[in-house]
């Protein structure tokens, strides 16, 4: 008798015949050729359970492999895994690899330990170790990763390129460059994956010059090599170098990808280079890059940080699918550019859209309240975050509330909020209160805030500078000078200021007290003339430029 044929949502599943046994090969072909969604897979899985064919390890492992292909389906994958009675190495490797790429990498390690304890006949294989190293790297557990490294050496697999590269990447991800460098130096022959990992490691740890040296020495580069350097420059604040490297990348005829575009947009955002940002946007459209949420968010962020709000809104409105990151970037962009009411309205629109605001969403709307000085609405949003969305406020949220209260002159309430908040205080929140004290004119509270700031970080110049400025604004010049002298005695230097300007599609960066630009003499000469003109202008305009401003104004030079 031929088996009955059942059809579920486009997947045709043969049912158990009235007599005899049906081979699992038909189901395996269905999974390979017709199954494309978890809903369809679950229908096939149910039929396999009903027919008893799921007891076959090969069949069950194919179901498991389908589930493990997507990190979001690992809960179901684990359910399938626990029902497999005879787990072969393929089954163990599949579930470990799936969890190593999911939101629960610790499960990969836990299952690996179970594998070691399961049976003497089941041992880790060449394909097992890379997934476990990946999990250790994502968790930042280099210490446990070293123990696995020792196991690899004991098994004689340290020269396997696949294992070695994932091991090196684990050390790089955890910031253990010495161990990574030892593995790198022990390599025989050129391996572009290992070179790229070391470049990323140096850049991540702030050793961008070493990263560039290694990049320059590469016998052969691929797109990842260029992306690693460009993103490394952005990570280390060398935004102009990132744009310059992209030009070199184009000269070498290397095709960029979406990751390249996002890094370049971030560089333009920090530099305020709107012209170059627009060109990159046009490049993305012209070359038909996928406008996924990461690219769209980077575009919105770039336009907003360059002050081009309408262009940012246009990108937001035209986005094919608005993920939460797009909403958050637009809300924060509006808040930081003087469109506080529109930012709050957009937050309300976000709530109506069906998406649920997260902690970043509330940073955006509280920023709008801080800039507009709306204490009541800030308090409403703060309560909404905790009571409706069950989001515990972070130090950033409390700092914004201090800004709101301080800006409204409610210094006592702001100080009380800091002292009673359940999170650990930091220098930023006390700096915010100190700045508010300076504006309002509360000397005693300014002293208390500065004391707390210095206690948290004795080597931080911010407390001395802010308190000195506060004293000066109150007319207490002796006390202001005293703070500056204390900084000098303790050999504390304020971080060098930096600014940039875009002229004719070229970015010019300037740093305080520098003189490296070829036209430094001309720049200083012109600034001296401007300084003199400002000082001789009559009436109140000259009062806007105190002596400190005029002196500091002169000592800027292009990097």
UniProtKB/Swiss-Prot annotation:
Keywords: Chloroplast, Plastid, Repeat, Transit peptide. It is found in: Plastid, Chloroplast. GO terms for molecular function: RNA binding. Residues 429-504 are annotated as: Type E motif. Residues 1-14 form a transit peptide. One of its GO terms (cellular component) is chloroplast. PPR repeats lie at residues 88-122, 125-159, 160-190, 191-221, 222-256, 257-291, 292-322, 323-357, 358-388, 394-424. GO terms for biological process: RNA modification. Residues 505-535 are annotated as: Type E(+) motif. Belongs to the PPR family. PCMP-E subfamily. This is Pentatricopeptide repeat-containing protein At2g42920, chloroplastic. The lineage of its organism: Eukaryota, Viridiplantae, Streptophyta, Embryophyta, Tracheophyta.
């Amino acid at each position: 008798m031929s088996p009955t044929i059942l059809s579920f949502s486009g997947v045709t599943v043969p049912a158990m015949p009235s007599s005899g046994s049906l081979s699992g090969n038909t189901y395996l072909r269905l999974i390979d050729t017709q199954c494309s969604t978890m809903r369809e897979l679950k229908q096939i899985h149910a039929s396999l359970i009903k027919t008893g064919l799921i007891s076959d390890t090969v069949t069950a492992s194919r179901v498991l492999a389908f589930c493990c292909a997507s990190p979001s389906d690992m809960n179901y994958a684990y359910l399938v895994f626990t029902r497999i009675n005879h787990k072969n190495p393929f089954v163990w490797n599949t579930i470990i690899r799936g969890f190593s790429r999911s939101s629960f990498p610790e499960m990969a390690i836990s299952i690996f330990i179970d594998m070691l304890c399961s049976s003497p006949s089941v041992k880790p294989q060449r394909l097992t170790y890379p997934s476990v190293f990946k999990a250790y790297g994502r968790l930042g557990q280099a210490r446990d990763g070293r123990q696995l490294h020792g196991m690899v050496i004991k098994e004689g697999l340290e020269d396997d390129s696949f294992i070695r590269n994932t091991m090196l990447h684990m050390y790089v991800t955890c910031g253990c460059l010495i161990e990574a460098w030892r593995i790198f130096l022990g390599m025989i022959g050129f391996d572009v994956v290992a070179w790229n990992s070391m470049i990323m490691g140096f850049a991540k740890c702030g050793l961008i010059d070493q990263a560039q040296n290694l990049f320059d020495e590469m016998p052969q580069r691929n797109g990842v090599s260029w992306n690693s350097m460009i993103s490394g420059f952005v990570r280390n604040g060398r935004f102009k170098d990132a744009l310059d490297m992209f030009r070199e990348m184009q000269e070498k005829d290397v095709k960029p990808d979406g990751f390249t575009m996002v890094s370049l947009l971030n560089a333009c955002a920090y530099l305020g280079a709107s012209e170059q940002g627009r060109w990159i946007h046009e490049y993305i459209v012209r070359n038909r890059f996928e406008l996924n949420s990461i690219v769209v968010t980077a575009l919105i962020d770039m336009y907003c940080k360059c002050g081009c709000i309408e262009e940012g809104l246009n990108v937001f409105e035209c986005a094919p699918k608005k993920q939460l990151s797009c909403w958050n970037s637009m809300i924060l962009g509006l808040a930081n550019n003087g469109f506080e009411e529109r930012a709050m309205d957009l937050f309300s629109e976000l709530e109506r859209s069906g998406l649920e605001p997260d902690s970043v969403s509330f940073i955006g709307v509280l920023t709008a309240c801080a800039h507009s000085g709306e204490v009541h609405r800030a308090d409403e949003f703060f309560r909404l975050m905790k009571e409706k969305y069950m989001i515990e406020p972070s130090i950033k949220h409390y700092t914004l509330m201090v800004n709101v209260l301080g800006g409204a002159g409610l210094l006592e309430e702001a100080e009380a909020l800091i002292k009673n908040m359940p999170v650990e205080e930091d220098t930023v929140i006390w700096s915010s209160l100190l700045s508010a004290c300076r504006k309002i004119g509360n000397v005693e509270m300014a002293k208390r805030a500065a004391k707390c700031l210095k206690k948290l970080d004795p080597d931080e110049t911010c407390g001395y500078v802010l308190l000195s400025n506060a004293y000066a604004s109150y007319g207490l010049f002796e006390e202001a000078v005293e703070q500056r002298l204390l900084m000098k005695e303790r050999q504390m230097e304020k971080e060098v200021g930096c600014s940039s300007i875009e002229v004719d599609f070229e970015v010019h960066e300037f740093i305080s007290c520098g003189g490296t630009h070829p036209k430094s003499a001309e720049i200083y000469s012109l600034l001296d003339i401007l300084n003199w003109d400002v000082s001789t202008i009559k009436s109140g305009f000259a009062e806007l430029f105190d002596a400190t401003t005029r002196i500091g104004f002169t000592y800027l030079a292009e990097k």
